[in-house]
């Protein structure tokens, strides 16, 4: 695996899969926060300690193979351009917070299912991504990597509290489980606000596509647990999965309601968006996201034939500003990005139809 490959292949292997409930659930993510006993927390570290953690991972973990994820490569933030960092964020491989650090790094698996972020809010954050609703499978893989790392380092752990983390909400298991979910039916029926209120009352968090502070572009929402103290990993996963399954049922009911009461209006909306995507010469990211959401809904409901349902996930990544500029070989102005975005979408749809 090389940096060029990571940058030039915008679609990670995990994005190409069709996991359970993938008509509504786009992806499942598990993140484990860990700190090392011998170092101060990242928020209090000096430059030398952050470099020592990087060197530890360079020595013990790079070019090592862990099946089924392949070899691991270490990407140091201060050796990447701002554009390369942005691409990693847009591919969901690192957090925006890590991208802004000088001495952060990412240990990335060849399959891109696994990324271990170094010197972010915690010393390490192990992230595992799967398509569809596969929280248990993602947790199993994250624990596999966690055990692999723990053979070489000693974690900060308290017998009564659990894993010690920088943020109090992560103390305990250090587990943050999240699901990326496409909810156009609930948005169109104006039920989404009520659903979000119910989710929040259950102690869960609802965010946009790139996490905290981001928008819910293309009717895509991220639902995750908030507290970890006093609950086992299995209980956290079971509780989140139960809520997600209820949201899936609510979304399916909303879609059925729209088809029953407004079928021709919905079909018109889908085909108008399809027409915009297939013919536009300039398109901004927000409009593209909304039209792609409509197209995906049309595919799921059978209005549109011959186009893969994965096109939403794929083009939501491919048309992000960083990846467009990476493909172009350098910075682009807003209008140039809109032109390239429209061109890429037209070409992708043409390939699908042929």
From Swiss-Prot:
Give the reaction(s) catalysed.
L-arginyl-[protein] + ATP = N(omega)-phospho-L-arginyl-[protein] + ADP + H(+)
EC number of the protein = 2.7.14.1
Q: What is a single molecular function from GO for this protein?
A: ATP binding
Keyword Signal (UniProt): no
Protein's UniProt keywords contain Nucleotide-binding: yes
Which residues are ATP-binding? 27-31, 92, 125, 176-180, 207-212
The record ties this protein, via SUPFAM superfamilies, to: Glutamine synthetase/guanido kinase
The UniProt entry, under Pfam families, shows: ATP-gua_Ptrans
Q: Which GO terms describe its biological process?
A: phosphocreatine biosynthetic process
Residue span(s) of domain Phosphagen kinase C-terminal? 24-254
Alphabetically ordered keywords of this record: Allosteric enzyme, ATP-binding, Kinase, Nucleotide-binding, Transferase
InterPro entries, A to Z? Arg_Kinase, ATP-guanido_PTrfase, ATP-guanido_PTrfase_AS, ATP-guanido_PTrfase_cat, Gln_synth/guanido_kin_cat_dom
GO CC list: extracellular space
In what way is its activity controlled?
Answer: Appears to be allosterically activated by the binding of pArg-containing polypeptides to the pArg-binding pocket localized in the C-terminal domain of McsB.
Which segment of this protein is annotated as the motif RDXXRA motif of the pArg binding pocket involved in allosteric regulation? 337-342
Supply the HAMAP family for this chain.
Answer: Prot_Arg_kinase
UniProt lists the family membership as follows: Belongs to the ATP:guanido phosphotransferase family.
What is the annotated role of this protein in its UniProt record?
Catalyzes the specific phosphorylation of arginine residues in a large number of proteins. Is part of the bacterial stress response system. Protein arginine phosphorylation has a physiologically important role and is involved in the regulation of many critical cellular processes, such as protein homeostasis, motility, competence, and stringent and stress responses, by regulating gene expression and protein activity.
Provide the protein name. Answer: Protein-arginine kinase
Annotated source species? Bacillus cereus (strain ZK / E33L)
């Amino acid at each position: 695996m090389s940096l060029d490959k990571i940058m030039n292949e915008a679609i990670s292997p995990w994005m190409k899969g069709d996991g359970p409930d993938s008509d509504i659930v786009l992806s499942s993510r598990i993140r484990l926060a860990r700190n090392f006993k011998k170092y101060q927390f990242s928020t209090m570290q000096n430059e030398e300690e952050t470099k020592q953690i990087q060197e530890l991972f360079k020595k013990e973990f790079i070019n090592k193979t862990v099946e089924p994820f392949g070899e691991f490569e270490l990407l140091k933030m201060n050796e990447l351009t701002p554009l390369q960092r942005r691409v990693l964020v847009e591919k969901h491989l690192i957090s925006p917070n890590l991208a802004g650090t000088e001495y952060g790094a990412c240990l990335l698996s060849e399959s891109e299912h696994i990324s271990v972020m170094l010197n972010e809010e915690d010393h390490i954050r192990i992230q595992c991504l799967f398509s569809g609703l596969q929280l248990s499978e993602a947790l199993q893989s994250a624990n596999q990597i966690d055990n692999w790392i723990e053979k070489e380092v000693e974690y900060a752990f308290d017998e009564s509290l659990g894993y010690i983390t920088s943020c109090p909400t992560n103390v305990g298991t250090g587990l943050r489980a999240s699901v990326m979910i496409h909810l156009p039916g609930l948005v169109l029926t104006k039920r989404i606000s009520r659903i979000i209120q119910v989710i929040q009352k259950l102690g869960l968090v609802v965010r946009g596509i790139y996490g905290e502070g981001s928008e819910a572009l293309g009717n895509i929402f991220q639902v995750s647990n908030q507290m970890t103290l006093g609950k086992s990993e299995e209980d956290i996963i079971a509780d989140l999965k139960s809520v997600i399954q209820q949201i899936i049922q609510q979304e399916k009911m909303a879609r059925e309601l729209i088809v029953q009461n407004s079928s021709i209006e919905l079909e018109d909306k889908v085909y108008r968006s399809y027409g915009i995507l297939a013919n536009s010469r300039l398109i901004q990211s927000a409009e593209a996201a909304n039209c792609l959401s409509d197209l995906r809904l049309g595919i799921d409901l059978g209005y549109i034939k011959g186009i893969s349902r994965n096109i939403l996930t794929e083009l939501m990544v491919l048309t992000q500003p960083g990846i467009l500029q990476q493909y172009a070989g350098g910075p682009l102005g807003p209008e140039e990005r809109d032109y390239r975005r429209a061109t890429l979408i037209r070409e992708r749809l043409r390939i699908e139809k042929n």
